[in-house]
Amino acid sequence: MPSTNRAGSLKDPEIAELFFKEDPEKLFTDLREIGHGSFGAVYFARDVRTNEVVAIKKMSYSGKQSTEKWQDIIKEVKFLQRIKHPNSIEYKGCYLREHTAWLVMEYCLGSASDLLEVHKKPLQEVEIAAITHGALQGLAYLHSHTMIHRDIKAGNILLTEPGQVKLADFGSASMASPANSFVGTPYWMAPEVILAMDEGQYDGKVDVWSLGITCIELAERKPPLFNMNAMSALYHIAQNESPTLQSNEWSDYFRNFVDSCLQKIPQDRPTSEELLKHMFVLRERPETVLIDLIQRTKDAVRELDNLQYRKMKKLLFQEAHNGPAVEAQEEEEEQDHGGGRTGTVNSVGSNQSIPSMSISASSQSSSVNSLPDASDDKSELDMMEGDHTVMSNSSVIHLKPEEENYQEEGDPRTRASAPQSPPQVSRHKSHYRNREHFATIRTASLVTRQMQEHEQDSELREQMSGYKRMRRQHQKQLMTLENKLKAEMDEHRLRLDKDLETQRNNFAAEMEKLIKKHQASMEKEAKVMANEEKKFQQHIQAQQKKELNSFLESQKREYKLRKEQLKEELNENQSTPKKEKQEWLSKQKENIQHFQAEEEANLLRRQRQYLELECRRFKRRMLLGRHNLEQDLVREELNKRQTQKDLEHAMLLRQHESMQELEFRHLNTIQKMRCELIRLQHQTELTNQLEYNKRRERELRRKHVMEVRQQPKSLKSKELQIKKQFQDTCKIQTRQYKALRNHLLETTPKSEHKAVLKRLKEEQTRKLAILAEQYDHSINEMLSTQALRLDEAQEAECQVLKMQLQQELELLNAYQSKIKMQAEAQHDRELRELEQRVSLRRALLEQKIEEEMLALQNERTERIRSLLERQAREIEAFDSESMRLGFSNMVLSNLSPEAFSHSYPGASSWSHNPTGGSGPHWGHPMGGTPQAWGHPMQGGPQPWGHPSGPMQGVPRGSSIGVRNSPQALRRTASGGRTEQGMSRSTSVTSQISNGSHMSYT
């Protein structure tokens, strides 16, 4: 365990600054116990520095649950430091000494429950309204700062000398709202606090409920169900209707106020701010109503203490003169005065207060008022002496000197016996005089009885404390499990998010790599095409040069041949003059040379036109090939994106299934834990109830045994009474016998005296025998009657107790059944809510997937459309330039058949079919040109899937050869077989709508 959590550890600076470092025993003197509870005790004390009267609440944090006690002390100190309001107790500081915290607060006269204890009757409605108004103002302050008191009752509402109402005992308070802890005092608990762990959280309205119960307490001297076992009261409050005021003497305003506070459903219950506007507290009332009540209470306390004082003086006086004697009369008198207090709200109920550090119902004597300080040293010494007397006698007697004089003057017997009183009486007088600054509305007998009850009811208090501790532990276990599962869920969610992010990053890297690869492919293809075009031009130029050389050689041969023929013709014709022959021959030579020059020029022109045409046609084929490559790359990229998106969606669905499985497993774990905790709680409740039943039966048996033990004494007394009556009867008969004997002896002759005496003796013996028989009969009848009456009374008490305990057990069973049903309903509701959340999340995920698929489809369509439009613009621009240069589109659309019959040296195979593309694009067969993808060319060859004409049989990737012959050029130029291409002005939109968009594979 960390040192900062160890009880009493001040290593944490935040905790250390909560406590003062001084020794409290040197700062505070004249300590006198004025209250006692489960936490410890409250003392009256005086601050030696300021001579100010204070109240000190001592809380030990040693022994069992020391860490829990220490945490409660820290929480209460922090709470007291935060609150500053006229209707809340003023905090002065906290000190530590020997594993005990000294919580110093302002001193108050007493609590509202002390008023009930002293007066033995309910308060007046106007007094209840004044007390309630002050308490409401304090609660409104707490609730406005999101704090909850959680232990409102008459014992925790204190009064000061000026009549101010103060809220005290914040050991159960919560600094956060809403809360869900099981704390408070059973009879004042709101239903939602009792069901806190089962049904969820609660807020400041629990204090409003407790205030309503407190109003009933002040109006009826005890809260509802106070005659019931505290545990049974919890079950009763949780499932039965709200209590109401029983008497009809209260006003409608008061009844409505109580009914509003005790609304079973918290949402229907008003807040403390709203209750401050209620007519019950706003009605006009005397300003001095509480001051007058306090004064009357102080007078009554003085009278009660004076009565006890006179008894003690009388007892001491008789002991001094007569020795020990049985004061039966005084015992009866004491019973008359003290017996009526047992029905009030005493510390038994308060000691059942749930928080271990809370002040009990009648021990709240720590509050505001600072009384006049002592003026002389003698008074201080007297007070120290008085303190010693009080602590040794475990009692508190409150009497001022003038009060003592007043009571002595009013009691002649006391005044007459005062000079003869022993030293003890003098010490008691000195003791009373020393308390002149100790004002209170609590009687000495109340403090003494409270201490005794605290010692006697330890078993019941320990049972309630154990139950409270169990509820706390269960709540802590549940919160620990929920936090653990939440951490597991967060970790799982982070892991899934990380996996998804990793996959997306991998996909992005793959896509970037693919795009770079495509860019490299395009660059490489551009270089290859440039080289191919250069080689193609060089090949044609080489062939044309070769053809030109051949042509020139043939012209030379033809020239020589023609020259020889002409010479032969001239030689045959001898009649022609030689000069004429020479001229004719020269002219023929010139004609031949001119014709050959024209033929050469025509050849060069045709070669140039052919070169330009074939280069232009080659460039168009290159452009179409690049377009096909772009289409293939775009198709590959889009298919890759589609594949990645499918994989991402599959992962999202798997993650959804994984999250769903984990959520259902967590919910099942929490519900199992909750069921187990409810089972343990119900088992503990049943065990506690059975122990309570056994204890009640044991107490009743003990009482009956005591009655049986006391019966011989009462029987002996009655037997002595009967015996006395018999003796009186015997004496009467003896006197009558003597009188009759004397009379008969006087009236009868002396000779008959013997017979008369004998007869009288027999008669007397017979009557005495009859009287003895009657005596025995009376004794036996009395014994049997008394025994029967005792048996019947005890049997009746046993039956009543059994019925009561059976009802409480049935109430517990009903409560537990209700809790189980509520838990099952809650589990079903949680399961339905989780299923709804999962279904909604699945629907949102599917909607997101559908939207992403639609967006991807739109992106694919847009990419294809933009690519087709760009390629169409490029082809159209190329064809326009060709038309400007004088080339026909039909001529450029297809190579001549002869062009495929030869290949130039060094020509490489194209990676794409320049005439028909690379097969089906976007899921449809392509035509010979990309003008209209997926449609046959009008007037031209069939699509690649149905080749025809001279193009049939050309393999993919075959080299393109061009037959360099004027005949081919002439045939092409003269309108030989050509293929009509489709115009590039065909609408791209119609192409896409007709099926040229992607077909996802």
Curated annotation (Swiss-Prot):
Please state where this protein is localized: Cytoplasm
The EC number(s) this enzyme carries:
2.7.11.1
- Residues bearing Phosphoserine are S9, S421, S445, S965
**How is this protein's activity controlled?**
Serine/threonine-protein kinase activity is inhibited by SPRED1.
Its family remark reads: Belongs to the protein kinase superfamily. STE Ser/Thr protein kinase family. STE20 subfamily.
Keywords associated with the record: Apoptosis, ATP-binding, Coiled coil, Cytoplasm, DNA damage, DNA repair, Kinase, Nucleotide-binding, Phosphoprotein, Serine/threonine-protein kinase, Transferase
Q: What is this protein called?
A: Serine/threonine-protein kinase TAO1
Which residues are modified to Phosphothreonine? T669
Its domain of life? Eukaryota
Q: Which residues form the active site?
A: D151 (proton acceptor)
Could you confirm whether the keyword Glycosyltransferase appears in this record? no
Q: Which residue windows does the record flag with biased composition (Basic and acidic residues)?
A: 577-587
Span list, region Disordered? 324-380, 404-431, 567-587, 905-1001
Write out the biased-composition intervals (Polar residues).
Answer: 906-915, 975-1001
Write out the residues that bind ATP.
I34, G35, H36, G37, S38, F39, G40, A41, V42, K57
* Gene3D superfamilies assigned to the protein according to its UniProt record, in alphabetical order: Phosphorylase Kinase, domain 1, Transferase(Phosphotransferase) domain 1
Q: So what does mutating K57A actually do?
A: Loss of serine/threonine-protein kinase without affecting interaction with SPRED1
UniProt subunit comment: Self-associates. Interacts with MAP2K3. Interacts with SPRED1. Interacts with TESK1; the interaction inhibits TAOK1 kinase activity. Interacts with MAP3K7.
Reactions the enzyme catalyzes: L-seryl-[protein] + ATP = O-phospho-L-seryl-[protein] + ADP + H(+); L-threonyl-[protein] + ATP = O-phospho-L-threonyl-[protein] + ADP + H(+)
- What species does this protein belong to? Rattus norvegicus
Q: Which gene encodes it?
A: Taok1
Composition bias (Low complexity) maps to: 350-370
Q: Which residues form a coiled coil?
A: 458-651, 754-877
Instruction: Tell me the GO BP annotations in alphabetical order.
Output: central nervous system neuron development; DNA damage response; DNA repair; execution phase of apoptosis; microtubule cytoskeleton organization; mitotic G2 DNA damage checkpoint signaling; negative regulation of microtubule depolymerization; neuron cellular homeostasis
Q: What does the record give as the function of this protein?
A: Serine/threonine-protein kinase involved in various processes such as p38/MAPK14 stress-activated MAPK cascade, DNA damage response and regulation of cytoskeleton stability. Phosphorylates MAP2K3, MAP2K6 and MARK2. Acts as an activator of the p38/MAPK14 stress-activated MAPK cascade by mediating phosphorylation and subsequent activation of the upstream MAP2K3 and MAP2K6 kinases. Involved in G-protein coupled receptor signaling to p38/MAPK14.
Molecular functions per Gene Ontology: alpha-tubulin binding; ATP binding; beta-tubulin binding; kinase activity; myosin V binding; protein kinase activator activity; protein kinase activity; protein kinase binding
Where does the Protein kinase domain start and stop, copy by copy?
Answer: 28-281
Concerning PTM, the database record says:
Proteolytically processed by caspase-3 (CASP3). Autophosphorylated. Phosphorylated by ATM in response to DNA damage. Phosphorylated by LRRK2.
